C-alpha cells in the first residue's frame, strides 16, 4: 500500500480533512492537495516523510490502551465522600485540602455524579466575588445583572430551603471577598458548602494572622488529605489501573517514580501502555 493510499485510509477512518492533515504536517493545503493528486513539484521525499510520521502517530494513538483518570473508592476517597455527605445533610461548611494530584477533584465529581442536587463550580485564577456570583446565577438560571448584594439576594432566594450542596473546587484561588460571599450564602440560604483546594486554602480562610476568625469559625470539618497518597490508597489505585500492579515489585517501582501522587501515577500508566 503506497503512502497516498495509506493517507486516504487514515483520513477516511478518522474523518481528517486535507486541511487538518496539512496543518498537522506543517505544509500548506495547496501543497497537500497537489501531492494527493500527484501534481506536487516540491520535495517529495520530505513530504512523504512528514505524512508517514503523521500516519504513524495516528495509528499509535489508536492502538494505545486508553487509561483515563477515574474515581477509585480508596479509604481516603471514602472519607472525602463522608465529609461531603455531612456538609450536604447537615447544611454545614466543610473543607477538603491537600497537595495537588491526590484525587480531591475526582472525589468531588464522584459525589456530584451521584447526587443531582449538587452545584459544582471550579474556580479559576481570575475569579472575583462577582465572577463567582455570576457563575452561580448562571447555574441557577437567574439574571446576572445588578450589584453584588442584588446577586446574593437572587441566589439566596433560589437556594433557600432546597437542601442543595454547593461545591467549590480550586477554592484556594478565591480572594477573601469571594470567600465571604460563600459564607453569606451559607448563612442566609442555609445550604451545605464544600470548598476544596491546596493547603493555602486554610490560610486564606483563617487569615495570615488569624484575622478572619468569623469566616473560619463557620467551618464544621476540614479534612487534610496530606501531601501524598497513603500507601494503601496508592496500591489500590495502581491495581485498578494496571493488572500488572498486582506484583509488589511493580507497585513499589510505580510508587517510587510517582512519589505517591495519583496524577503522576495515571501519567506513568499511560506511558507503560503506549
Regions found by a protein language model. Give the residues of each.
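Conserved small helical "lid"/interfacial subdomain of P-loop NTPases
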Residues: 224-250
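Conserved NTP-binding/hydrolysis module of P-loop NTPases
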Residues: 130-146
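Conserved P-loop NTPase "ATPase switch" module shared by AAA+ and STAND
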Residues: 156-178, 182-188, 192-193
Amino acid at each position: 500500500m503506497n503512502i497516498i493510499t495509506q493517507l486516504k485510509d487514515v483520513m477516511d477512518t478518522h474523518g481528517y480533512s486535507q486541511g487538518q492533515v496539512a496543518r498537522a504536517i506543517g505544509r500548506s493545503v495547496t501543497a497537500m492537495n497537489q501531492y494527493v493528486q500527484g501534481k506536487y513539484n516540491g520535495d517529495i521525499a520530505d513530504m512523504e516523510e512528514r505524512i508517514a510520521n503523521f500516519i504513524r502517530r495516528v495509528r499509535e494513538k489508536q492502538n494505545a490502551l486508553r487509561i483515563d483518570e477515574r474515581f477509585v473508592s480508596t479509604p481516603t476517597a471514602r472519607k472525602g465522600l463522608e465529609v461531603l455527605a455531612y456538609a450536604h445533610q447537615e447544611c454545614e461548611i466543610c473543607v477538603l485540602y491537600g497537595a495537588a494530584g491526590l484525587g480531591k477533584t475526582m472525589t468531588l465529581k464522584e459525589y456530584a455524579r451521584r447526587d443531582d442536587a449538587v452545584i459544582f463550580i471550579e474556580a479559576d485564577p481570575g475569579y472575583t466575588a462577582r465572577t463567582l456570583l455570576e457563575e452561580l446565577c448562571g447555574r441557577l438560571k437567574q439574571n446576572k445583572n445588578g450589584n453584588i448584594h442584588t446577586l446574593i439576594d437572587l441566589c439566596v432566594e433560589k437556594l433557600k430551603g432546597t437542601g442543595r450542596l454547593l461545591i467549590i473546587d480550586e477554592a484556594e484561588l478565591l480572594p477573601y471577598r469571594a470567600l465571604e460571599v460563600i459564607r453569606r450564602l451559607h448563612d442566609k440560604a442555609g445550604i451545605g458548602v464544600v470548598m476544596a483546594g491546596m493547603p493555602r486554602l486554610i490560610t486564606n480562610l483563617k487569615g495570615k494572622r488569624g484575622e478572619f476568625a468569623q469566616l473560619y469559625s463557620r467551618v464544621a470539618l476540614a479534612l487534610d488529605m496530606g501531601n501524598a497518597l497513603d500507601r494503601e490508597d496508592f496500591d489500590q489505585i495502581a491495581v485498578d489501573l494496571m493488572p500488572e500492579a498486582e506484583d509488589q515489585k511493580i507497585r513499589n517501582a510505580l510508587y517510587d517514580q510517582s512519589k505517591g501522587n495519583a496524577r503522576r501515577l495515571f501519567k506513568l500508566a499511560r506511558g507503560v501502555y503506549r
